[in-house]
Structures are given as C-alpha cells and as structure tokens.
Amino acid sequence: MNTYVVDDSKYKCIYAGTEKAAAFNNEFENGTRVRVWFEGHHIKTFEKEQREVCGVGEWIVKYDAATELQKEVNRLEKTYFKKKELLDTIRQADGVGREINEKKKSILNYSGC
C-alpha cells in the first residue's frame, strides 16, 4: 500500500491505497481543508477553524465516515429489532390460529359432523 499526498493551493488530499490514479483524481473545493481517503473511500475531512483575531485556528473534523456509518448501523439495528419483534408476534398468532383450527377439526370429527 502506498500513501500519496496531493497538495494544491486550496486543498490537500491524503490518500492511502493501491490506486495511484484515485489519489490525483479529486476535484478540490475552495477553502483550507484536508481530505483523507483510504482505498478509494473518503473517510475524514478536516477544516481549519477561522478565528477573528488572527485568522488562524485549530483543525476540526468536518466529516468522519466511521461516525456517519455507525449512526446508520444503529438506525438499521433499531429497525431490524422492531421488525423482528413484529414478525415473531405474527408467527405466534399464526401458531395460535393453527391450534384453534386443529381443535375445531377434532371437535367436528368427534361429533360426527
């Protein structure tokens, strides 16, 4: 794996991966930012905080792919468990319905109907 640093006057890109062309194939926007890529995936963006007094600030995280993906996983997990609970309830109701039908059949057969 190689690491490539693309530096122009507006933007810096740090790319780690096996595809050299991918590191140099990004359209940069205006601003003081650093984008971090790994194997073709944008994983973080840092932006220089602008301070009124001296115009220089700290680097702050503007985008974190891991955080965004974790939010999505949490949302999907929550939805999954709700749907699973509903499915279990429906299957339980189907089982009760089958038991009732079986009892009705045995009563009808026993009574000679």
From Swiss-Prot:
Name of the featured protein: SPbeta prophage-derived uncharacterized protein YoqP
Organism the protein comes from: Bacillus subtilis (strain 168)
